[in-house]
Amino acid sequence: MSLLNVSGISKKQGEAFLLRNINFIQEPSQRLAIAGSTGSGKTTLLKIIAGLVQPDDGNVMFEGTRVKGPLEKLLPGHPQIAYLSQHFELRNNYRVEELLQMANKLSQADAELVYKVCRIDHLLNRWSDELSGGERQRISFAKALVTAPALLLLDEPFSNLDAIHRSVLKSVIKDAEEQLNTSCILVSHDPVDLLSWADEIMVIHEGKIIQRGAPEEVYNDPVSEYAAALFGKYCVITPGLIRLFPFLENDKRRFIRPAAFEINADENGAVGEVISSSFMGSYYEVEVALAESKLTIYHTQNILRGEAVRISIQSV
């Protein structure tokens, strides 16, 4: 049996559609990510799945049972689905342990495992107003996990976190999946968060799913320029680019990522001029002007502005 079956979900705000006929299935332990621009309907979809927002049409089935909306029950939500908002809040004037005990549905041993997984066992005696942003996020995560959810909906969990706390929270999510058997749906604006984690990515645009697939497929073969832009820099295959690289005329791709280009000494390569070179840590991001195109290329070495280079491209 599928963990989650979303069928025909639509939601309007006034005359405008927030979601249009959303359909998908999530299997147990499947890592499902949702990508889309601000206002595309991602948060509304998560809240409908959690039973916090009433859909206008369609059904959400969780382990074979329909998830009721807030208009159908006294207390909104589903006991086995936890929604963690990017706008998390913790009550003031409480110790961390007290906040967690209010929500806890686990045995003491299982609750202690959650605290360990979330890296908060040393924070239990702290007051809620004595916590850093990263600590508050992990405690909110633990507060969701102690309700014993089978499905965790993560809405921009890494927003407003520095690199260190982002890394810690990613490890916490991984351990929750592996040690607590929790399935997750993740929404993030950072393509690295989604591409490195997901088994499958859904791309939403104006309330509709426009693409679904493995991270490699969604990244390398986006269905539109909108989908391409969500996951980083790209180059549109134009007639001018085809004139420089004739084999592209038979290429199925509409867009090419920077990693597909190479700067080398190939005599058959197209000649370009370096516009800029920026150090990105493990590589340089090089902007190159060609006769009819401008390309972004990832390269291992710095190249001076104005230098002439030859560009080749990987065929498929």
Describe every region a protein language model picked out.
Residues 246-316:
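Non-catalytic connector elements of ABC transporters
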Residues 152-156:
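Catalytic Walker B motif of ABC-type/P-loop ATPase nucleotide-binding domains
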